[in-house]
Curated annotation (Swiss-Prot):
This is Ketol-acid reductoisomerase (NADP(+)). Pfam families: KARI_C, KARI_N. Involved in the biosynthesis of branched-chain amino acids (BCAA). Catalyzes an alkyl-migration followed by a ketol-acid reduction of (S)-2-acetolactate (S2AL) to yield (R)-2,3-dihydroxy-isovalerate. In the isomerase reaction, S2AL is rearranged via a Mg-dependent methyl migration to produce 3-hydroxy-3-methyl-2-ketobutyrate (HMKB). In the reductase reaction, this 2-ketoacid undergoes a metal-dependent reduction by NADPH to yield (R)-2,3-dihydroxy-isovalerate. SUPFAM superfamilies: 6-phosphogluconate dehydrogenase C-terminal domain-like, NAD(P)-binding Rossmann-fold domains. It comes from Xylella fastidiosa (strain 9a5c).
Amino acid sequence: MVNVSITTDYSRMLFMRNTTSTLKIAIIGYGSQGRAHALNLRDSGFDIIIGLRPGGPTEAKAQADGFTVQSPDQAAKHADLVAVLTPDMVQKKLYEEVLAPNIKQGACLLFAHGLNVHYGMITPRSDLDVVLVAPKGPGALVRREYEIGRGVPCIYAVHQDLSSHAEQLALTYAGGLGGARANIIKTTFKEETETDLFGEQAVLCGGVSSLVQAGFETLVEAGYQPEIAYYEVLHELKLIVDLFYEGGITRMLEFVSETAQYGDYVSGPRVIDGSTKERMKAVLKDIQDGTFTKHWIAEYQAGLPNYKKYKQADLEHPIEKVGKQLRAKMVWLNSEKTNDTTPPMSSKVV
């Protein structure tokens, strides 16, 4: 490992430049994020090896991309930094059985999500630097933005700093992804994990999905055509989210009609009110005290019986049948699809 004392912005830049030419990085996993990380880091000048199960489904893809592929244990042995980019629920076994016995002393262990470390499923060896670097976007976007000379914002955190330059390693890694071209924000494993889980459960996945289904059911039960209900509560959601993404809630309000604005002001609080916020707080509490993670681990170890039941119920919801029929006629959707068909590596992937 490079051993440099970081005292100024200049010396930090010097550290990053020198580290780029000497750091060997093992990327464990080659899904959406793993591939984007590997390609961007290689193009930034790092020496990259990929750690995958021999004969696994992504081995050929990594080799076609020009990478040396080794088994995870061998990749870890030869790396100065090991990036764990596999789904959450396989990381504990991967670390305990494969990585911990093989990572060399003084190396850096990097995660893209803090769940396993924060909740104690993984206790990293004390002789390692342990950091987190998480681009705030899917792998396809991380790669695409890098290729056109831009970048996706990243957050980073330090859990263990044995070398006294773990933070600089995290920043160097984030810079290699292209994050420094956009924005890099320091956080903690606790903050990243708890806010990420809350966002997924209360808003981005659980909250929005339940809101859309309830809206669809309300219209259909009132006698409106399912096709019209689908357009109004699901299809047009993209228009609103794109405006949120570009400039926040105020930008969305600038681009909708005055009628829509007034409806937002008077009816939004009737649907999402103080009681909703109280239930959100209960969701957050379950995340903070580990209740959610405890239940999720038990569910996973039991073979996912409830998970499968919930998933099947969503698949059988009437909005899915209607949506499939309507989307089949939206020929432009095919042209908008990217090659990034691998599910993102995160807490929501099994």
